[in-house]
């Protein structure tokens, strides 16, 4: 119908994961009440949903660490919307607002990523602009604050403020063969 003709190319996808452990004191293998800190269960979970339509994409991720599993940083304790973003990319220019995962070059200077199995996430909440003026040439600028567990983003004194620019020229894509 005409009502739905505008959204036929929209896509929604997502994923979720729940990891859990049940703790039982077993002094024969070194598990004591002290090592499990009185906890009976540790649960780490997340769910994320992404939406795309044409040049636009958006997404959100909910996380819950109730209580974080043994071996994970206790500062992960909590739950809520951990990440969100909206992005527009027409091939020449791309703008992203929200949580950004990226790297400059091979990642030695700047790299943000999340590794769920390790409880690591240093997403950058801010803005990124990518400009591709010619084949093989990419210019990138970004600004934001790094994630620090569940500390509010407004508390700048407790987190890193990152500003950066990056330029790349891939000669293999610049010349026709």
Give the residues covered by each predicted segment.
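Sec/Tat signal peptide C-region and signal peptidase I cleavage site
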Residues: 2-5
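Outer-membrane beta-barrel channel domains
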Residues: 7-177
């Amino acid at each position: 119908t005409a009502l739905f003709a505008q959204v036929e190319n929209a896509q929604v996808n997502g994923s979720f994961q729940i990891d859990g452990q049940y703790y039982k004191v077993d002094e024969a293998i070194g598990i004591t009440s002290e090592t499990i800190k009185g906890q009976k269960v540790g649960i780490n979970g997340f769910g994320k949903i992404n939406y795309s339509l044409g040049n636009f994409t958006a997404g959100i991720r909910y996380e819950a660490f109730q209580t974080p599993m043994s071996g994970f940083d206790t500062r992960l304790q909590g739950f809520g919307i951990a990440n969100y973003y909206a992005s527009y990319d027409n091939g020449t220019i791309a703008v992203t607002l929200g949580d950004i995962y990226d790297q400059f070059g091979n990642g030695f200077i700047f790299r943000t990523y999340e590794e769920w199995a390790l409880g690591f996430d240093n997403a950058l909440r801010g803005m990124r602009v990518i400009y591709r003026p010619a084949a093989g040439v990419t210019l990138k600028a970004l600004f934001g604050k790094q994630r620090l567990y569940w500390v509010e983003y407004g508390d700048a004194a407790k987190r890193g403020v990152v500003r950066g620019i990056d330029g790349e020229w891939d000669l293999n894509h610049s010349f026709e063969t």
